[in-house]
């Protein structure tokens, strides 16, 4: 079972961990929310340290920079590829081909600029109000969305790509276990405050549903890029939803 944690750590982070990968990569999906918790705590700690400067904009920038470095920017890369493929291609085949191209196009650049702009604005307010729990919650829920999409959707490519090994064996139990982990973390981090929990879950549901429906329409399934993009968009939407409560 712990080999799944090793695979999850190696897939989602730059952290080097001992041990061997799981024979079935889908077993790592159970651990995605816990890896998200580790990333969230590290980034929230950096945000707290950054606030020693009394400059929330700088603290928010530390969160974004650490997120990129800790994850090798694989999820941001997925969002850029998704934007290029979904909005630059005319057919399913052309979209998949564009998404596989390592070059970043104009749609990808625009998507990344908007993503980091929205994240930075939201994080600036979050750290200014000392609401670090939102940083952790957004990162955990973003990994949970990846589990859901990998489990309920088919793989869009013909048996190729890194994500194929995760999607192939994914199913309902992966969602159930990941959901329990995510909900437990959310309740503890949010200190059982009902409204913030509901708002965060609604933002997650909206992000995951929209990404899934768009992927189903454009390429009839998911790829690693779709899973990465879903993570980035969920983080952004959860953090932006925090603003509703901060200014409520």
UniProtKB/Swiss-Prot annotation:
The chain crosses the membrane at residues 32-52, 60-80, 103-123, 134-154, 170-190, 195-215, 227-247. Pathway: Cofactor biosynthesis; adenosylcobalamin biosynthesis; adenosylcobalamin from cob(II)yrinate a,c-diamide: step 7/7. One of its GO terms (molecular function) is adenosylcobinamide-GDP ribazoletransferase activity. Its cofactor is Mg(2+). Keywords: Cell inner membrane, Cell membrane, Cobalamin biosynthesis, Magnesium, Membrane, Transferase, Transmembrane, Transmembrane helix. InterPro entries: CobS. One of its GO terms (biological process) is cobalamin biosynthetic process. It catalyses: alpha-ribazole + adenosylcob(III)inamide-GDP = adenosylcob(III)alamin + GMP + H(+); alpha-ribazole 5'-phosphate + adenosylcob(III)inamide-GDP = adenosylcob(III)alamin 5'-phosphate + GMP + H(+). It is a multi-pass membrane protein. Its EC number is 2.7.8.26. Pfam families: CobS. It is an enzyme of class 2 (transferase). The keyword Isomerase does not apply. It is found in: Cell inner membrane. One of its GO terms (cellular component) is plasma membrane. Joins adenosylcobinamide-GDP and alpha-ribazole to generate adenosylcobalamin (Ado-cobalamin). Also synthesizes adenosylcobalamin 5'-phosphate from adenosylcobinamide-GDP and alpha-ribazole 5'-phosphate. PANTHER family: ADENOSYLCOBINAMIDE-GDP RIBAZOLETRANSFERASE (PTHR34148:SF1). Belongs to the CobS family. HAMAP family: CobS. This is Adenosylcobinamide-GDP ribazoletransferase. It comes from Prosthecochloris aestuarii (strain DSM 271 / SK 413). The gene is cobS.
């Amino acid at each position: 079972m712990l080999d799944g944690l090793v695979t999850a750590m190696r897939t989602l982070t730059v952290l080097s961990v001992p041990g061997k990968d799981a024979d079935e990569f889908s077993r790592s999906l159970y651990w995605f929310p816990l890896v998200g918790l580790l990333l969230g705590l590290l980034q929230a700690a950096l945000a707290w340290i950054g606030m020693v400067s009394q400059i929330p904009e700088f603290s928010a920038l530390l969160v974004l920079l650490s997120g990129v470095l800790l994850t090798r920017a694989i999820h941001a890369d997925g969002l850029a590829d998704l934007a290029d493929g979904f909005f630059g291609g005319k057919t399913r085949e052309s979209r998949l081909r564009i998404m596989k191209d390592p070059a970043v196009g104009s749609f990808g650049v625009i998507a990344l600029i908007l993503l980091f702009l929205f994240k930075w604005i939201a994080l600036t307010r979050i750290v200014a109000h000392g609401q670090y729990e939102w940083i952790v919650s957004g990162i955990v829920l973003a990994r949970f969305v990846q589990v859901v999409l990998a489990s309920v959707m088919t793989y869009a490519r013909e048996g190729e790509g890194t994500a194929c090994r995760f999607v192939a064996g994914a199913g309902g139990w992966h969602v159930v276990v990941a959901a329990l982990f995510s909900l437990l973390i959310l309740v503890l981090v949010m200190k059982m405050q009902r409204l913030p929990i509901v708002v965060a879950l609604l933002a997650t549901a909206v992000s995951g549903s929209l990404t899934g429906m768009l992927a189903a329409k454009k390429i009839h399934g998911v790829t690693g890029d779709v899973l990465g993009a879903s993570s980035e968009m969920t983080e952004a939407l959860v953090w932006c939803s925090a603003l509703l409560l901060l200014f409520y």
